[in-house]
C-alpha cells in the first residue's frame, strides 16, 4: 500500500487530454504501472469505449485486477507484444496509444526489485521477475567487451571500460567472496571507479540505468512498439509518449520525425510533390511537466511528452 501511495503519475491530465479524441474509441495504455493514466482514460470514455493495457510487472497486473470495469482489459506482457495481442482480440485499429516509459516509483523504491543503488537488495532489475535473465545472472557471464558496450551505449558512461574491468575482476573473486548479486556491492564497485561527481547524481546512476535497459530490452522493445502503434492508429488517432532520458527520447523523436516527413526525392527526377505519398503522422508538439508538478514530484523533472496524430488513412 505504501508504494501505491508514493507513486505519482507524471503529466497525467496533459497525457489524457492529448490521447482521448473519441469517447467511444479503443485505446491502449502500453505501460499500466499503477494505473494512474488508465483510470483517467476510463473516466473520459463512454460506455462504448474500450481500454486495453499492458504491463510486464506482476504487481502491476495485481493492481489492474482490482479495476472492475467491462471496458477495461489488462494484458500481462511487454508492450512490444501489442500488435499480436490486439490481433488476437480482433482489434485492427485503435484511437490512441499511450506509452509512459521507464520504471515506476514503486519499482525503484522496492529494494527487492534491484533497480536502485540507494538501498541494498538483490541484483535483479527485471520488470517481470518471473521471466528472463536477471542483472546478476548477466553480470556473471558477460565479457568485458559486452559490459563496456552496454554501459557506454545505454548509460552514456565515459568510464564504461574501467567499470567493466572492475566487474570482471570482482567476478574472478567469486570463489572467495561469493557471487556479485547485490545492488549495494555493484554501486560500491562503480563508486570506486567513477571518481568524478555529477551534481545531484550518484556515480552509479548511469551504470544502473544501462544494465536495466539491457536486461529488459527496453530500447529494442520501444522501437517495436512504435512501429506497432503506427500500424494500429486509425486516421485521427493519437500517439502519446512520455520519456525520461535522452536515449528513449532520441528514438521517439527520430521515429516521429521520420514518419511525419515527406519522402526525400532527387530534384532532378520528374516527380511533383503532389504525386508523393503523404506522411502518415503529423507532429503535435511536445510538453514538459510544470514547475508545480516538478516541485511536488522531483522525479518528473526529466520527463518529456511527445504527441503525434495519424493523418493518413
Curated annotation (Swiss-Prot):
Gene Ontology terms describing biological process: rRNA base methylation
Pfam families recorded = Methyltransf_5
One example GO MF annotation: rRNA (cytosine-N4-)-methyltransferase activity
Its EC number(s): 2.1.1.199
Its annotated compartments are: Cytoplasm
Which catalytic reaction applies to this protein? cytidine(1402) in 16S rRNA + S-adenosyl-L-methionine = N(4)-methylcytidine(1402) in 16S rRNA + S-adenosyl-L-homocysteine + H(+)
- What is the recorded function of this protein according to its Swiss-Prot or TrEMBL entry? Specifically methylates the N4 position of cytidine in position 1402 (C1402) of 16S rRNA.
Q: What protein name applies here?
A: Ribosomal RNA small subunit methyltransferase H
- The source organism is Burkholderia thailandensis (strain ATCC 700388 / DSM 13276 / CCUG 48851 / CIP 106301 / E264)
Amino acid at each position: 500500500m505504501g508504494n501505491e501511495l508514493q507513486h505519482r503519475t507524471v503529466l497525467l491530465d496533459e497525457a489524457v487530454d492529448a490521447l482521448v479524441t473519441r469517447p467511444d474509441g479503443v485505446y491502449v495504455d502500453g505501460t499500466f504501472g499503477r494505473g494512474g493514466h488508465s483510470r483517467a482514460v476510463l473516466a473520459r470514455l463512454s460506455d462504448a469505449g474500450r481500454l486495453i493495457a499492458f504491463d510486464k510487472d506482476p504487481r502491476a497486473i495485481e493492481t489492474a485486477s482490482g479495476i472492475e470495469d467491462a471496458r477495461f482489459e489488462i494484458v500481462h506482457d511487454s508492450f512490444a507484444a501489442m500488435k499480436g495481442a490486439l490481433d488476437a482480440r480482433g482489434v485492427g485499429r485503435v484511437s490512441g496509444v499511450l506509452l509512459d516509459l521507464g520504471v515506476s516509483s514503486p519499482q525503484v523504491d522496492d529494494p527487492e526489485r534491484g533497480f536502485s543503488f540507494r538501498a541494498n537488495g538483490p541484483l535483479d532489475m527485471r520488470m517481470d521477475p518471473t521471466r528472463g535473465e536477471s542483472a546478476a545472472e548477466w553480470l556473471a557471464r558477460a565479457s568485458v567487451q559486452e559490459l563496456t558496450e552496454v554501459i557506454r551505449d545505454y548509460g552514456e558512461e565515459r568510464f564504461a571500460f574501467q567499470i567493466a574491468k572492475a566487474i570482471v575482476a570482482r567476478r574472478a573473486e567469486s570463489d572467495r567472496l561469493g557471487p556479485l548479486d547485490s545492488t549495494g556491492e555493484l554501486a560500491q564497485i562503480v563508486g570506486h571507479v567513477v571518481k568524478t561527481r555529477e551534481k545531484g547524481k550518484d556515480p552509479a546512476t548511469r551504470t544502473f540505468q544501462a544494465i536495466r535497459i539491457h536486461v529488459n530490452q527496453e530500447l529494442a522493445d520501444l522501437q517495436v512498439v512504435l512501429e506497432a502503434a503506427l500500424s494500429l492508429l486509425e486516421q485521427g488517432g493519437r500517439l502519446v509518449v512520455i520519456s525520461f532520458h535522452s536515449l528513449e527520447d532520441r528514438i521517439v523523436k527520430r521515429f516521429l520525425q521520420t514518419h511525419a516527413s515527406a519522402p526525400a526525392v532527387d530534384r532532378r527526377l520528374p516527380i511533383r510533390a503532389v504525386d508523393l505519398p503523404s506522411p502518415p503522422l503529423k507532429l503535435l508538439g511536445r510538453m514538459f511537466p510544470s514547475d508545480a508538478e516538478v516541485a511536488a514530484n522531483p522525479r518528473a523533472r526529466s520527463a518529456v511528452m511527445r504527441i503525434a496524430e495519424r493523418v493518413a488513412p
